[in-house]
Amino acid sequence: MLDRLVLALLAVLSVPYALAVRLRALAYGAGIFRVKQLNRPVISVGNLTVGGTGKTPMVALVARLLMARGKRVAVISRGYGGSLEGKTHIVSDGQRVFLSAAEAGDEPVHLATAVPGLMAVIGTDRYAAGLLAQERLNPDVFILDDGFQHLRLHRDLNILLMDCSAPLGNGMVLPAGLLREPPLALKRADLVVYTRCTGAEAPAVHGAIPSCRAGHVLAGVELLPGGERQPFTALYGRRGVAFAGIADPDAFFASLREEGVDLAATVSFGDHCPYGEEEVARLMAARRTAGADFLITTGKDAVKLGPVLSRLGIVYAAVLEMSLMDPKPLETAIDKVL
């Protein structure tokens, strides 16, 4: 009974929220709110729901596709969770990474580290961050990370990611559901990419919008810091403790087990969690209790371990990549922008 009352209250609260975000989108569409435009093409990657749909590996995939076409690529990120959040800074010029994850947030630092040659800037004002990149880095094209709701910046290609198993969550907007906007916002997308697909046909919520399917692939492990990529078989015969501070840690742990990694224990932290004394203590206690030989985590978590890494013993980072099952729609959409 109590659960129903709570859900009913959340549903009531969802109404003004949905109305507010819908009116905001309409105001931008009608020109009441000004949309600013950079003088380079902008490709936005975002989603309708909160939580993990694979934005970071998708940004990396799009960046690699663009770079394979000879383009200089810069990612514009908010810098969420970093001490410099709200300020405009260059994270990487494609050769060097200037800021730590503690300063710039885990996602831009992870992307700049994982994709050689990728430039990255941060700023709450993504237009100002883009102007800084144009002046200092001279990119050919921008990728706007988590940009579907950042309507203030014009984009030439609007890529929307949707989880294959639950593309609209429970169909309700925050706080009763997972949707950041009402489902009508889907119409702003130029391309829908269904993520976490396992081979089955994707749902058909995209209507006439071009779509493709993608799956998450663990491509191996790297011994920290800076080790070469190895297959998961390098871990066979040993027991590990997996940990993650991401939106869906359980999916990460399940993927490791599917790769044959013997996990003696798992430890979940909050999304974008910084690693300090409390987190180190939890990890070391879990490792001792389980009698594990190593720790293993995500690439996004790995970039935050620098100050504490030497205290954790043997630590591996799993390499997560996005694999397209039908790449043609994405490649066609990108080529139209260039």
Curated annotation (Swiss-Prot):
Binding residues for ATP: T49, V50, G51, G52, T53, G54, K55, T56
Keywords recorded for this protein, A-Z: ATP-binding, Kinase, Lipid A biosynthesis, Lipid biosynthesis, Lipid metabolism, Nucleotide-binding, Transferase
UniProt xrefs under PANTHER family: TETRAACYLDISACCHARIDE 4'-KINASE (PTHR42724), TETRAACYLDISACCHARIDE 4'-KINASE, MITOCHONDRIAL-RELATED (PTHR42724:SF1)
InterPro entries linked: LpxK, P-loop_NTPase
Its EC number(s): 2.7.1.130
UniProt-recorded name of the protein: Tetraacyldisaccharide 4'-kinase
Name of the coding gene: lpxK
Gene Ontology biological process terms in this record: lipid A biosynthetic process; lipopolysaccharide core region biosynthetic process
SUPFAM superfamilies recorded: P-loop containing nucleoside triphosphate hydrolases (SSF52540)
Biological pathway: Glycolipid biosynthesis; lipid IV(A) biosynthesis; lipid IV(A) from (3R)-3-hydroxytetradecanoyl-[acyl-carrier-protein] and UDP-N-acetyl-alpha-D-glucosamine: step 6/6
NCBIfam families attached to this UniProt entry: lpxK (TIGR00682)
Name of a matching Pfam family: LpxK
Organism (species): Geobacter metallireducens (strain ATCC 53774 / DSM 7210 / GS-15)
GO molecular function: ATP binding; tetraacyldisaccharide 4'-kinase activity
Biological role stated in the UniProt entry: Transfers the gamma-phosphate of ATP to the 4'-position of a tetraacyldisaccharide 1-phosphate intermediate (termed DS-1-P) to form tetraacyldisaccharide 1,4'-bis-phosphate (lipid IVA).
HAMAP family, per database record: LpxK
